[in-house]
């Protein structure tokens, strides 16, 4: 029996925010994977180690969490006034598919640094010392992200003293601006509030009717009050992720929320859409102990938020969900805004399982409709490994 040898593909393994992923230049992928389709999906699944019925991704670069089962493809931008096109693929851990329906806000922090180092940004736009402004086209959702990347001696500066809760070591700060984050390109997926309301009654079988804010900003997100589903808003991962009843309940929320938001036509479609919408529960500020053991005081935050990604409670906060939080907080009457104390505000600091995060948003009413010019937050990014990733030659 002859066995097909492995091939090697240039790749870089990078931490961005509180996530990690495998980054590729589009031109480095095998020819059949340079275009969307089954070959590309099969390749990325094999790289990450999916589908894995054991749920461990031992035979790949993934680490069996939603924060680490991620891939990114970058290329020089084909759009005016942009430097790089950024495509994100969320690889299912135990199912054979890649979800292309949304962005990863955390890995967005690594796009600018990688694009500069990979030669995808025009050299004339990179200062010898200072901050490079990288104009990113987020191809999944058709939106612009501006990355502010520190540069020292003509190279991306990765080390620094910026601390990010959920990441053990300090690094250089990368500020991100998510421009016009509501909805998707040309309005696909609906307006900022797809139902037309800042709060709706959401019917979830086996749970009941819940007050919910369903917003499409950064990423489609469903916010509910913690107390309405029996939680305090101070929970850490084990409280949810080891509770089969809780996991079953949270599996239903995105299905029925996605229907109301117009993201799917029937509940069955939700099985192929694990990445969106996100579900989060909120409450007013309170004291709690983060997963690191650090005490978070109510006085240090405006509200508490816990969010789920791919059916599990996130260890910190998804970057795109943070954009949704900042946007919803800026609009009076949403559940997020009310949990933060109500009124108009252009920034909030919220508590999550690993600590706190500040996010800002510029919101205004135009002809009676709310619009958000941009959402702003800071993350960090660091290359962990670069070289080649290997996969069997017949894997795609």
Curated annotation (Swiss-Prot):
The metabolic or biological pathway listed in the UniProt record of this protein is: Organic acid metabolism; propanoate degradation
* Catalytic activity as recorded in UniProt: 2-methyl-trans-aconitate = 2-methyl-cis-aconitate
Task: Write one Gene Ontology MF term.
Answer: intramolecular oxidoreductase activity, transposing C=C bonds
The organism is Cupriavidus necator (Alcaligenes eutrophus)
What additional remark is attached to this entry?
Answer: Could be involved in the catabolism of short chain fatty acids (SCFA) via the 2-methylcitrate cycle II (propionate degradation route), however it does not have a 2-methylcitrate dehydratase able to produce 2-methyl-trans-aconitate.
Q: Binding of substrate: at which residues?
A: 19, 66-70, 106, 278, 309, 314, 319
Give GO BP annotations, semicolon-separated.
Answer: propionate catabolic process, 2-methylcitrate cycle
Question: Which Enzyme Commission number(s) are listed?
Answer: 5.3.3.-
Q: Which SUPFAM superfamilies match?
A: Diaminopimelate epimerase-like
- Tell me the protein family, please: Belongs to the PrpF family.
- Keywords of this entry: Isomerase, Oxidation
Q: What's the short name of a Pfam family annotated to this entry?
A: PrpF
Cysteine sulfinic acid (-SO2H), modified sites: 104
Outline the subunit composition.
Homodimer.
Q: Can you say what this protein is called?
A: 2-methyl-aconitate isomerase
Which PANTHER family does the record match to this protein? ACONITATE ISOMERASE-RELATED (PTHR43709), DUF453 DOMAIN PROTEIN (AFU_ORTHOLOGUE AFUA_6G00360) (PTHR43709:SF2)
Q: Which residues form the active site?
A: 104 (proton donor/acceptor), 318 (proton donor/acceptor)
């Amino acid at each position: 029996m002859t066995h097909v040898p492995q091939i090697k593909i240039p790749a870089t393994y990078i931490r961005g925010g509180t996530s990690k992923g495998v980054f590729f230049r589009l031109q480095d992928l095998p020819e059949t994977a340079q275009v969307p389709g089954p070959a590309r999906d099969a390749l990325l699944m094999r790289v990450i180690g999916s589908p894995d019925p054991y749920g461990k991704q031992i035979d790949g670069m993934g680490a069996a969490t939603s924060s680490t089962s991620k891939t990114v493809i970058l290329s020089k931008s084909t759009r005016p006034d942009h430097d790089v096109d950024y495509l994100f693929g969320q690889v299912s851990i135990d199912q054979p598919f890649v979800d292309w329906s949304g962005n990863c806000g955390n890995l967005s922090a690594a796009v600018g640094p990688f694009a500069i180092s990979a030669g995808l940004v025009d050299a004339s736009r990179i200062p010898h010392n200072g901050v490079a402004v990288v104009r990113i086209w987020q191809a999944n959702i058709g939106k612009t992200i501006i990355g502010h990347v520190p540069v020292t001696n003509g190279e991306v500066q990765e080390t620094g003293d910026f601390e990010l809760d959920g990441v053990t070591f300090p690094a250089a700060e990368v500020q991100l601006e998510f421009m016009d984050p509501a909805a998707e390109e040309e309005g696909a997926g609906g307006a900022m509030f797809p139902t037309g309301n800042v709060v709706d009654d959401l019917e979830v079988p086996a749970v009941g009717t819940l007050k919910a804010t369903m917003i499409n900003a950064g990423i489609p997100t469903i916010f509910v009050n913690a107390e309405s589903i029996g939680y305090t808003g101070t929970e850490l991962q084990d409280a949810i992720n080891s509770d089969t009843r809780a996991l079953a309940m949270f599996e239903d929320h995105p299905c029925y929320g996605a229907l109301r938001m117009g993201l799917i036509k029937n509940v069955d479609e939700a099985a192929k859409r694990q990445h969106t919408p996100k579900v989060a529960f909120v409450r007013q500020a309170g004291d709690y102990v983060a997963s690191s053991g650090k005490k978070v005081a109510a006085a240090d935050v405006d509200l508490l938020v816990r969010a789920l990604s791919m059916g599990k409670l996130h260890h910190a906060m998804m970057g795109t969900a943070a954009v949704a939080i900042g946007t919803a907080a800026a609009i009076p009457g949403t559940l997020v805004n009310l949990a933060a104390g109500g009124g108009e505000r252009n920034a909030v600091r919220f508590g999550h399982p690993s600590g706190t995060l500040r996010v800002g948003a510029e919101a205004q009413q135009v002809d009676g409709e709310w619009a958000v010019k941009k959402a702003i937050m800071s993350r960090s990014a660091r290359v962990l490994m670069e070289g080649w990733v290997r996969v069997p030659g017949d894997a795609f």
